[in-house]
Amino acid sequence: MSVNSNNSENLIDIFIDELWLEKGLSKNTLSAYRHDIHSFSLWYKGSSLLEVQRVDLLDYLSLRLKEGYSSRSTARSLSSLRAFYSHITVKYNLKENPTARVDSPKLGRSLPKTLSEEDVIKLINSPDVDDNIGLRDKAMLELIYACGLRVSELINLDILNLNLRQGVIRVIGKGEKERLVPMGEEALFWVQKYIEEGRPYLLKNDNKVSELFLSKRGKSMTRQTFWYRIKEYAIKSDINKDLSPHTLRHAFATHLINHGADLRTVQLLLGHSSLSTTQIYTEVARHRMKELHNEHHPRG
């Protein structure tokens, strides 16, 4: 079976389309698959991805690790390539799946990057709330930290999914799972202020965008835009850490546990399907306690 002379981009496009049709994966997940396979395709100089051998994959994975990519990132890349080659091995009747005898890199259990409560406050207070964009950013930072949202959940949050009277939001998480999360007084105040004073100026007259948070052009926000804004505010706040929107989700969970919240509650608020995923935040809390003990105890 041929596909336009086995053009690599066509192979990737067809795989992504069929993956969406068969499994109904989210846009972000499909984008991650495409990125991983496309990155390998750019590295591979053969005439077609159908000609890839096991040794090519081993060389590629080895190079990634040498260039400083983490074991976790490299394992994810291999996982995407496994799915791709499992699919096309059958579809194009390949003699062998080149990923079949390739082992994943061993993963150490790394602790999530988080922020102290003091740094979170500095970050959240850094936007200029007298400006419509700054007011939007203030509301976004307050909300993502107050509710422990994933960045995709934040930027896709529909204004109709807010219950301002009760102070809760309806979140559509991974696998279209829904959960209700309380906002807290500070986040509620700034979100309401943004809706009343900032959002009307960002929303264009002919625009019917239902997402809560809008770009300066009146369209839906992107993950990249919010990531960039966080980087700017980190610099402004003199926070010398590599921050991402997910850092505030980690901070939300860690700070809840530091203040005595039970794991089951944190699991429900985060939308984790497994309690074991949430348990890593107890390790973060213990690690931080050890750091403070070593730093401040006279015999630490």
Give residue spans per PLM region.
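Conserved catalytic core of the tyrosine transesterase superfamily
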Residues: 1-300
